[in-house]
Amino acid sequence: MLAVFGHLNPDTDAISAAMVYARLLTRQGTEAQAYRLGEPNFETAYVLRELGLEAPPLLTELPAGSKVALVDHNESAQSLPALGELDVTRVVDHHKLGDLTTINPPYLRFEPVGCTGTILLKLHREAGLSVEPQDAKLMLSAILSDTLHFRSPTTTQDDRDAVAFLAPVAGVNDVEAYALAMFAAKSDLGNTPAETLLRMDYKVFPFGDPVQPQNWGIGVIETTNPAYVFGRQQELLAAMDQVKAEDTLSGMLLSVVDILNETNRTLVLGATEAKVLREAFGAEAEGQVADLGNRISRKKQIVPTLEKYFAPEA
């Protein structure tokens, strides 16, 4: 049985892609099972409730040599521990190629689109297989989530075309209303502990020297209610300090993205982070908050800028 899973701290695309791809592979004759590497966030939980589905089983480890398929990620820091000991047979992703190494030649499908769901729709078409309504809604939800309903600069025409095709198959007549309902669920943070908020959409990235990299943790909270998040600023800064120590990081950032206004204000933990934001982005931290303007995409606008900043001198 092939294990299919997305990244740690899974978002809607990571969980939806695992579920859809596992079913697609099974329909094509490869027995596959979807898994998750963490708890679904509030938005993903809403999508699953809408569909009457349970989240995939939680996966914490696999025996060395187990065959796996990765979706929505390919970097070891964002995946199952000891990924290098597993037989990665397939990767379907829309991120840059990271440090992935494999035991055997894998099937790779990378495309510069806004969401793995967009690629999975293409795989259905290429296989000559119909898209089931349940899978259509999972892919639709993932694309709306990853692209912030086309607000993100990662959005491509392929993503727009995919949504136009998937919405009627999924039975979603008003895409805007459905997207807003998803974002409202994502923003309903209630009394969630600060560290949980921080880790909901949190990834570790190695920058600089590949032999001795600087590992930075970059969290994102996408919300329609940023005032609530900043009302808990001191709690979040304390959680950032704790996570920075726990994960042995060189730096820690938390971007609070206002979905509707398409702005990013980032919490700045200390002097190290303030210096990097000033020199890399030209953003000054005031009251431990830096205004990063319309840089709302970690993948396309934050991480590449930091990679360039930390790049070793030739």
Swiss-Prot record:
Belongs to the PPase class C family. Its EC number is 3.6.1.1. Its cofactor is Mn(2+). It catalyses: diphosphate + H2O = 2 phosphate + H(+). This is Probable manganese-dependent inorganic pyrophosphatase. PANTHER family: BNIP - RELATED, MANGANESE-DEPENDENT INORGANIC PYROPHOSPHATASE-RELATED. GO terms for cellular component: cytoplasm. Binds 2 manganese ions per subunit. Mn(2+) 1 binds at residues 7, 11, 72. It comes from the Bacteria. Its main location: cytoplasm. Pfam families: DHH, DHHA2. Keywords: Cytoplasm, Hydrolase, Manganese, Metal-binding. On the 2D-gel the determined pI of this protein is: 4.65, its MW is: 32 kDa. It is found in: Cytoplasm. Mn(2+) 2 binds at residues 13, 72, 94, 146. GO terms for molecular function: inorganic diphosphate phosphatase activity; manganese ion binding.
